[in-house]
């Protein structure tokens, strides 16, 4: 996403040097080497654990700040010492990719493999389908369409497919890309008059793993280009794996010809993990990080954090960081203190503005269009859904809700009754409403 990770680190180093004295930099930070960059995490290495601990204790915030300045966004920093098992695993993974007869045309997170994926009732179909595709590309399910909410493991499974094929199928060209990157590259190819180069890149491969396909909704030129890319690969019997936050029929403004193609193969969903799976995920994470976490702590976290895997693992990292900084043992009391902000913030205040913003994001429309007088279906219908949700999730009066939308109360009544009736008959709409309620409530 940001070019070669070594170049990223070089730019970060320049910023760090401007913040530190030469003595501080040359004593400690000069020993850091860039190891890998995947899924918004920059992996760095140090010669030994002592140096790693000094850097984590004194300089990590400076590194975070410098990384944010260089990339214009937050990226995770993970420092590993060369005597750690995780360092050796990542190093070996990179060497395998570089020496493999297959060609990996994009960076995959070395931690996202089938071995590190925790299987439960909520994801076992998606896991089985992905494993089948990895074992027999273009012979099992083609295309494979995976959908589910944020942080549930879709990207993990796609990277796992890439790693497995790269390791076990010689000669395959494998491409992982987000649909946002696909769109940006298309725009640049048009601007620079390099359309043919762009097409050759995406049509002369054996496996295409494209993440977050819902991003191309409302983008006519991107949909047109992806349609032809899909056809070229499919007709050549190449494997296509697609992920989204919702099933094809629920992606708004997606062209029908693309929607039908996405439904040609297998569609597998991933649901939020149940309690037992959440505990298993936390245990796996603790084990991979060589952390000794009491069972009662894992049980508490699994009970309180129910939304997705990313938040579960984030809570565990927060607990460990809190214990390290305060030089305390990890127990239930410390855990409750470390997570008090996260747990209490789960009941955030619900306003009409919040509802409007979440509905706009979900249906990929602009907030200014949403509040305008436009009556096209792709705007008017989500607006009615937002009115319905405002009536369901707030205590505001009908006139007040209408005022927030620039409408009168009779319009709100009509919208509420319309959506209420349609939910009873349309399972797809009912799922969309439930998903929106979760997003609005913050879990």
UniProtKB/Swiss-Prot annotation:
One CC-aspect GO term: plasma membrane
Gene expressing this chain: dnaA
Region (Domain III, AAA+ region): 107-323
Keyword Cytoplasm: yes
Organism: Caldanaerobacter subterraneus subsp. tengcongensis (strain DSM 15242 / JCM 11007 / NBRC 100824 / MB4)
Functional description taken from the UniProt entry: Plays an essential role in the initiation and regulation of chromosomal replication. ATP-DnaA binds to the origin of replication (oriC) to initiate formation of the DNA replication initiation complex once per cell cycle. Binds the DnaA box (a 9 base pair repeat at the origin) and separates the double-stranded (ds)DNA. Forms a right-handed helical filament on oriC DNA; dsDNA binds to the exterior of the filament while single-stranded (ss)DNA is stabiized in the filament's interior.
Gene3D superfamilies with a match to the protein in the record: 1.10.1750.10, 1.10.8.60, 3.30.300.180, P-loop containing nucleotide triphosphate hydrolases (3.40.50.300)
S-S bridge residues: none
Residues that bind ATP: 151, 153-155
Subunit structure: Oligomerizes as a right-handed, spiral filament on DNA at oriC.
Family: Belongs to the DnaA family.
Domain II as annotated region, ranges: 73-106
Region called Domain I, interacts with DnaA modulators, residue ranges: 1-73
Record keywords: ATP-binding, Cytoplasm, DNA replication, DNA-binding, Lipid-binding, Nucleotide-binding
Name of the protein this chain belongs to: Chromosomal replication initiator protein DnaA
Chain intervals for the UniProt region annotation (Domain IV, binds dsDNA): 324-443
């Amino acid at each position: 996403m940001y070019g070669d990770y070594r170049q990223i680190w070089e730019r970060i180093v320049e910023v760090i040097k401007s913040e530190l004295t030469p003595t501080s930099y040359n004593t400690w930070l000069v020993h850091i080497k860039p190891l890998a960059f995947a899924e918004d995490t920059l992996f760095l290495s140090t010669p030994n654990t002592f140096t790693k601990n000094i850097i984590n204790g004194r300089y990590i915030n400076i590194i975070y700040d410098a990384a944010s300045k260089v990339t214009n966004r937050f990226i995770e920093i993970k420092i590993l010492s060369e005597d750690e098992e995780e360092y050796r695993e990542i190093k070996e993974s990179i060497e395998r990719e570089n020496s493999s007869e297959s060609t990996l045309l994009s960076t995959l997170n070395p931690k996202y493999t089938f071995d590190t994926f925790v299987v439960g009732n909520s994801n076992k179909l998606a896991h089985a389908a992905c494993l089948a595709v990895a074992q027999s590309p273009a012979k099992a399910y083609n295309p494979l369409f995976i959908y589910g909410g944020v942080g549930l493991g879709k990207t993990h499974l796609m990277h796992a497919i890439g790693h497995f094929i790269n390791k076990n199928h010689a000669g395959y060209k494998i491409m992982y890309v987000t649909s946002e990157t696909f769109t940006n590259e298309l725009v640049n190819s048009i601007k620079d008059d390099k359309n043919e180069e762009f097409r050759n890149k995406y049509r002369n491969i054996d496996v295409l793993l494209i993440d977050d396909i819902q991003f191309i909704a409302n983008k006519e030129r991107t949909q047109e280009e992806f349609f032809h890319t899909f056809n070229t690969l499919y007709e050549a019997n190449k494997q296509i794996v697609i992920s989204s936050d919702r099933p094809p029929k629920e992606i708004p403004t997606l062209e029908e010809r693309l929607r039908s193609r996405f439904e040609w193969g297998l569609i597998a969903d991933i649901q939020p993990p149940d309690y037992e799976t959440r505990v298993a995920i936390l245990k796996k994470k603790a084990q991979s990080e060589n952390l000794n976490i009491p069972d009662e702590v894992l049980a508490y976290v699994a009970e309180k954090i129910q939304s997705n895997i990313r938040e579960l693992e984030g809570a565990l990292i927060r607990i460990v960081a809190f214990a390290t900084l305060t030089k305390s043992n990890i127990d239930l009391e410390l855990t409750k203190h470390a997570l008090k902000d996260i747990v209490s913030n789960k009941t955030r205040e619900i306003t009409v503005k919040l509802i409007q913003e979440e509905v706009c994001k979900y249906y990929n429309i602009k907030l200014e269009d949403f509040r305008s007088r436009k009556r096209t279906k792709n705007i008017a219908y989500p607006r009615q859904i937002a009115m319905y949700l405002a009536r369901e999730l707030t205590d505001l009066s009908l006139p007040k809700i209408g005022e927030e939308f620039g409408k009168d109360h009779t319009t709100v009544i009509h919208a509420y009754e319309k959506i209420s009736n349609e939910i009873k008959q349309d399972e797809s709409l009912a799922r969309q409403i439930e998903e929106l309620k979760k997003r609005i409530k913050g879990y």
